Regions:
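RNase H-like, metal-dependent nuclease domains and their acidic two-metal-ion catalytic environment used
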Residues: 1-27, 31-33, 38-159
């Protein structure tokens, strides 16, 4: 028979809470309009998970720019690279460059314009950019041997 592996799927809830809310955010190269002299934690920095993940992607791209163009050193897992062979690379780049950030929130937190707001302004949904952004979300990885048990069809729980 075929030996399979079960994979835990974790849905992305962009409007949900930020990851590691009490960890201090490192504002490397930030052009954020807030007080960059004051340390802020993730909960103070971002309105939701979507904003946090887009900002993490922005930071990763900025670090890559600093590494490639300015000679700065960063760990490889803090950088990003896209294959030049991606057929929709120009479209992906366009989407990533036009993610609108909101500046009018009183909290001073990073906020990304919602999809309904983008639609009202005639901005197409950034589906490719969203896919790359979602990869920034922290997911706990664990291993479990499922070969000895299987889900109960009646309850959906593991026996």
């Amino acid at each position: 028979g075929v030996k399979g592996k079960r994979i835990k799927l974790v849905p992305f809830h962009g409007g949900g809470a930020v990851d590691s809310p009490f960890d201090v955010y490192d504002e490397i190269g930030s052009d954020f309009a807030g007080d960059i002299d004051k340390e802020r934690n993730n909960a103070e920095m971002f309105t939701n998970a979507r904003a946090q993940c887009y900002w993490m992607l922005r930071d990763r791209m900025f670090k890559t720019y600093l590494a490639v163009d300015k000679g700065h050193n960063f760990p490889n897992d803090e950088l990003i690279s896209f294959s030049s062979g991606i057929s929709e690379l120009a479209g992906l780049r366009a989407e990533l460059c036009r993610i609108p950030r909101k500046y009018n929130n009183a909290s001073g937190k990073v906020q990304i314009m919602s999809k309904p707001e983008m639609k009202k302004l005639g901005i197409q949904s950034p589906n490719m950019a969203d896919a790359v952004m979602m990869l920034q979300k922290h997911v706990d990885i664990y291993e479990h041997d499922y070969t000895d048990n299987s889900p109960s069809r009646a309850t959906g729980n593991w026996a």
